[in-house]
Amino acid sequence: VCIYGGIMEYDKKNGFTKIKSEPDFHLVIANSNIKHSTESVVAGVKQFKEENETEFSKLCNDESELVEDVLKLLSVNNIKELGQKIIQNQEYLETIGVSNEKLRDMIQVGQKSSFGAKITGAGGGGCIFSLTDESNLEHSINQFRDKNYECFSVKIDFKGLDTF
């Protein structure tokens, strides 16, 4: 992504595909400062899958549909609906058990001040992100800082690597 810029989609079958869209949004990244083990989070998800095969299968199908919806929303720069899909994805992550109380609190702060917020990465700790635009960027940052959460904003670079 750093080389090509923009947004990439990945799936096991096709690998990486660049999304031909340049939506105009910011992400506010907030850090829980909770150290976590990806290995133990993955083991927990595996256990959830083994104990809840039907539910896990349904979640995987629902997630595939959600990805298709997100790709469409990105192509038309529909940030508000994209935020709703982010919230929906976070609900799936809650179901499989990769969240905790601090992450839930951070997500709640993010969802109140942005279009949507969710865990990024494996879960269990680390960071969350909130989807914002210019209208709610500073408010979202201030809400996280008011709760003493470290945060910063990022915007997607659509240009990628450039020679000098």
Show which residues each predicted segment covers:
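Conserved glycine-rich beta-strand-loop-beta hairpin in the small C-terminal domain of fold type I
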Residues: 126
